Amino acid sequence: MIIETIVSTIDKNERVNFSPFGIKKKNKQIFISPYIPSKTLINLEATKCAVVNYTDDTSFFVNCIIGNKKFKKKRCKNFSGFFLEDCFGYEQVKVKKIIKNKLRPTFVCEIDKSFHIKNYEGHNRAKASIIEACILASRVHLLGKQKIFNELSYLSIAVEKTAGSLE
């Protein structure tokens, strides 16, 4: 199963980068597969660590896609990284292995520590649709224009029916 998250990584100068990521999780391992080239890829190779943030706040996903990544964040204790101040929880992960691939290498990460901040309050179709729209926007170079417009048209139905004020 793919879980939509916000992954934060840092470069060697401790500048943080936030990216929306569909990660895979199995037991105590998390699999992160960034595209080549990407800042997440460069940072994971350089620092061998990341923070996986769990949130249903779609504004994080939208703002990452449009390049507005000035989020409220906190420094992790005893770990090189930052987590989103407003998330359900997060996991600090360390890269243990890299599976090479020409398009999307996979970083096999071990969970160092998990943190719970607040409770998840349930699923919302509008939020899921907005996250799906962000995924489409991040793949404009891979998908046809008509396919994207068709998908967005369908997704807008759930947003119109179930959105709150934030969506």
Task: List each model region and its residues.
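Basic, polyanion-binding surface patches
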Residues: M1-Y90, K94-E167
